[in-house]
Design a protein with these regions (language model features):
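C-terminal structured interaction module
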Residues: 183-247
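Solvent-exposed helix/loop surface patches that form functional interfaces
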Residues: 2-21, 91-183
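Short, hydrophobic/aromatic-rich segments at coil-to-beta transitions
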Residues: 2-10, 35-41, 65-72, 93-95, ...
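A short, polar/proline- and glycine-enriched secondary-structure boundary/capping micro-motif
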Residues: 50-53, 79-88, 106-112, 225-230
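N-terminal cleavable signal peptides for secretion/export
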Residues: 1-57, 63, 71, 78-85, ...
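Hydrophobic alpha-helical segments, especially N-terminal targeting/anchoring helices
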Residues: 62, 175-176, 206-208
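Short, surface-exposed linear segments at secondary-structure transitions and domain or protein termini
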Residues: 63-69, 113-126, 210-216, 233-240
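Short, solvent-exposed aromatic-acidic interface loops
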Residues: 45-47, 73-83, 100-106, 219-225
Length: 247
């Protein structure tokens, strides 16, 4: 019998003009069976203007090669709640989507060819596609991303959009977080391969060596997301990580 074992856990803080407005705690689990899957579990908390807490729980299961298999996003705010689910059949590339919200249950499915990522509110999964498909050191790398606008009520089916990642330093860069000196992979994420000014400005991501999860990211508008705590269980999984970190 396989067992899901914890390999990484941590916490992100979300900042606007240096002030924290949200936080995310996460755990990454690995199935101990041969060619076992990974599970990313995240909880996001944010106080809204009414004083209530918006709570979002994300479960993101991938294959051992980091292809998405099952994704669940549960949102709750006061009396409102909704659930999104994606189920992926990797053999025929069929994606089954279900939304349950204030206006009932909506279902549809679609064939999606090639490699793809599924966008969620969980920051820990924001660069997961770089494990599924490595960034090209010489060129901008494109990724197909599925996303929806469905939050409390059903708006429409998921859409496919390309996002582009560009490596900014082949040898990595040194950054400081919580008085710790860290080595990170610096890349920029944008909606346009040529940084067209009519598109939104790119965001700077600094990726860790722990399954490429971000140490931090800087967005236009003086927005920042960064690791507040991070523990990698390297003693048990020394072959997966190049170094050990505890923040």
């Amino acid at each position: 019998m396989s067992i899901d074992e914890k390999i990484v856990e941590g916490k992100y803080v979300f900042l606007k003009d240096g002030n924290q407005y949200s936080e995310e705690t996460f755990t990454i689990l690995m199935d101990t069976a041969p060619n076992g899957n990974y599970m990313y579990k995240s909880e996001i908390l944010c106080r809204v203007t009414s004083g209530e807490f918006l709570k979002i729980n994300v479960d993101f299961e991938t294959s051992n090669s980091f292809d998405p298999l099952n994704v669940k996003v549960f949102r709750s705010l006061g009396e409102n709640s909704s659930t999104e689910r994606y189920e992926v059949n990797l053999k025929d590339k069929q994606v089954y989507y279900t939304f349950s919200g204030m206006d009932g249950v909506h279902k549809f499915d679609r064939n999606v060819s090639g490699k793809f990522h599924i966008s969620t509110p969980a920051f820990v999964t924001s660069t997961l596609m770089t494990k599924m498909k490595k960034m090209n050191a010489a060129h901008v790398t494109s990724y197909n991303v599925l996303s929806t606008q469905n939050i409390w009520t059903y708006e429409k089916q998921f859409v496919e959009n390309d996002v582009f990642l560009e490596l900014k330093s082949l040898g990595g860069v040194e950054i400081k977080l919580n008085d710790k000196d860290l080595h990170a992979t610096h890349c920029q994420m944008s909606e346009d391969a040529y940084n067209n000014p009519e598109k939104s400005a790119p965001a700077d991501f600094y990726l860790s060596k722990y399954l490429n999860i971000p140490y931090k990211a800087e967005f236009p508008g003086n927005l920042e997301v960064k690791i507040d705590k991070l523990k990698a269980f390297e003693n048990e999984y020394k072959n997966m990580f190049k170094s050990w970190l505890l923040l």
